[in-house]
Regions:
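Short amphipathic C-terminal alpha-helix that caps PH/PH-like domains
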Residues: 414-422
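N-terminal chloroplast transit peptides
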Residues: 1-19, 24
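C-terminal accessory "lid"/substrate-recognition subdomains
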Residues: 31-48, 198-401, 411, 425-457
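Non-catalytic alpha-helical coupling and interface elements of nucleotide-dependent molecular machines
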Residues: 77, 140, 165-169, 188, ...
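N-terminal, immediately post-signal peptide pro-regions of secreted/luminal proteins
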Residues: 22-33
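Short, well-ordered alpha-helical microsegments
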Residues: 132, 156-157, 320, 411-414
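Nucleotide-state-sensitive switch-loop elements of NTP-binding domains
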Residues: 44-61, 66-219
Length: 457
């Protein structure tokens, strides 16, 4: 089977990393500050909460040109007698005649996507404000069998899911009146490898969600795949059969639990994307292949196609410049890598590592427990003991824990290069004060709540 990999291997190979960026741990979408917009969604109107049954919901995601809107049209014209409501960002994008919509018995709500940052205790979530209002309103009408939400091509699925589970100040939540049933992502079989390899920022294509949206196309594609229950591998008629298998197995490695369905023109049985009961938030959060690898769950069946993975663990910090050399020179066969890292120059802060195709980001993940004052540790003895389980040696829980997924990877060689990027025995002996003076070309980390000029190196 490896012989069949050759022709498509270059398309999946990310080539040299083209984008090395700093990214805040929670930065996934453009965010709005907590203002009057947040106060406006502090509670759901009582009349909206008066519903006899929960409204099941399917969310459609997919990059521009994947066939997501075609899937929506297929659902609307083959709804098998159900009374369906639809929420879309732009009516013009559906391109269905208004008379046909009326004949189909479909109610379409146009609600431009609007993000708002909400706080619940110490947890901060970015939610879809438009959905908080519209879904509750539709559910309160008690006349629909199903709701389909078509997200924009640059949307990530997780904020939608968080919108359903988030409890507002009065204790109400969308999940009280509607149930998130299925998260569907449509993938262009021909374009996926190419876009994954690119490091184009959405902003460079005029697609940014707003000021400060530094995501790349590759970041977005991976986010859409990793949080899906059902993935339509679309436009397979435009790709050689062997290459379709290769793309499917790559997606399977990124999200082992998703059901992958091959389609042409997004044609699929209604029951495969509606009423599946597949969505579970906790399961979805654990679905990404990199996280399953860290948890010891391997996906060996993809290895015959040259798709493999390995975990790198170490208990000494990276030298920033040697790590930078690895990132820009040695990751051409790596399609996805994720985890946390320890940089010698930023000894007290955990680094969050995320790479998708040709895009690499690194940002702060909070202080290591070993660098956290005892007063800020968990008060519960069992929780504190759990924290200490990660401690080893003089540097506590500081460590490298990274998962690499790629095609044609030489794991042994990559491990060797990563090991060479760690501090030497002599450098380790010099201690943290000496490490702080090492050259460090990585972008500075803007810590949570810090102002410009208060970055951490």
């Amino acid at each position: 089977m490896l012989a069949a990999v050759g022709a498509f291997h270059h398309a999946f190979s990310s080539g040299p990393i083209r984008s090395v960026r700093m990214v805040a741990l929670t930065q996934t979408t453009h965010r709005l500050a907590m203002t009057q917009q947040q106060q406006a969604v502090a509670s759901l109107p009582e009349k909206m909460m008066q519903t006899d049954k929960k409204l099941p919901v399917t969310v459609l995601s997919g990059f521009l040109g994947s066939g997501k809107t075609t899937l929506l049209k297929n659902i609307l014209t083959n709804k098998e007698g159900m009374k369906v409501a639809v929420i879309v960002n732009d009516m013009a994008e559906i391109n269905i005649d208004s008379k046909l919509i009326k004949n189909l018995g479909v109610d379409i709500t146009v609600a431009p996507e609007k993000m708002v940052e909400m706080e619940n205790g110490c947890v901060c979530c970015t939610l879809r404000e438009d959905l908080l209002k519209e879904v509750a309103s539709l559910a309160g009408e008690n006349k629909y069998d199903y709701l389909v939400i078509e997200s924009t091509g640059i949307s990530e699925p997780m904020p939608v899911a968080e919108t359903f589970t988030f409890r507002l100040e009065d204790g109400t939540a969308l999940e009280d009146v509607a149930t998130l049933d299925t998260m569907v992502t449509v993938v262009d079989a021909a374009g996926f490898p190419r876009e994954l390899r690119a490091a184009d920022e959405l902003g460079a294509r005029g697609l940014a969600a707003g000021e400060g949206d530094g995501r790349t196309v590759a970041d977005l594609l991976v986010a859409q795949v990793e949080f899906a229950d059902v993935i339509l591998l679309n436009k397979i008629d435009l790709v050689e059969a062997n290459d379709v298998v290769l793309v499917e197995n790559m997606i399977k490695r990124l999200n082992p639990d998703a059901r992958i369905i091959q389609t042409i023109n997004s044609k699929v049985g209604l029951q495969q994307v509606v009423g599946t009961g597949a969505f579970d938030f906790d399961k979805a959060a654990q679905a990404p292949g990199w996280l399953q690898e860290l948890n010891g769950e391997h996906v060996p069946e993809t290895e015959e196609y040259g798709i493999s993975s390995f975990i790198f663990r170490a208990r000494r910090p990276f030298h920033p410049e040697r790590l930078m050399d690895f990132v820009v020179s040695d990751m051409s066969t790596v399609i996805r890598s994720k985890g946390f890292c320890w940089l010698a120059t930023r000894n007290d802060q955990m680094g969050v590592w995320s790479q998708a195709g040709g895009s690499y980001t690194q940002g702060p993940g909070g202080a290591w427990w070993a660098a956290t004052p005892a007063a800020e540790w968990p008060e519960d003895p069992e929780e504190a003991a759990c924290v200490r389980e990660d401690f080893e040696g003089p540097y506590g829980d500081r460590r490298q824990e990274l998962v690499f997924i790629g095609m044609g990877m030489d794991a042994s060689q990559l491990r060797g290069r990563l090991t060479n990027a760690l501090l030497t025995d002599k450098e380790m002996a010099a201690g943290p004060a000496s490490w702080a003076a090492l050259e460090d070309s990585f972008p500075e980390w803007l810590l949570e709540g810090a102002e410009e000029g208060e970055e951490d190196k």
